[in-house]
Amino acid sequence: MPNTLTKAENFDGRIIGYTTVGIDAADDSFTLTDSFAVTDSAHKVKFVAPPSGVVEIFVSVYGDFLRRFAYFGLSDNATYNTLDVTHEHIVAQPPTASGDRVINHQWVITGLTAGTAYEYWFGAKSTHSLAIVLRWGGNATEEYAPFIMKATALPTAVADFAVYG
């Protein structure tokens, strides 16, 4: 359902798109390579841009990082096509011991056209092929958390109360 509110202040902090993959489903995984790729065609979020034209995209996923660097990015296509190189971030550095953990990461996207529908896919890569495995889901005890991706409306940039830069 598209956003129907019209006042900008009604959007600030509102979740305007949400996807979860792996609730009560067989666990799944994706092994990273040294090139960005969309991790699963369902790993996406769709939303209608708020009046501010600014959103925060959030992702949460479990990973076996095996002492390697991991990078997360956003794509505007189900086959990885970078949204912008400034949205490709290093998110995990080599740990001293086990690298298994949940990574929560956010992007702030500005310059969107209010009222326009957008759809972004989650992409990832590693510095070494086949070294990192992302995992999600489960339908039994002691399995993985679901993959989560959401879009939250951010306020219009005003004075010192919302600064994007």
Question: Language-model features: where?
Answer:
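Short, intrinsically disordered N-terminal pre-domain segments
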Residues: 1-12, 165
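Extracellular carbohydrate-recognition regions
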Residues: 7-25
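Terminal beta-strand-rich extracellular "head" domains
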Residues: 20-165
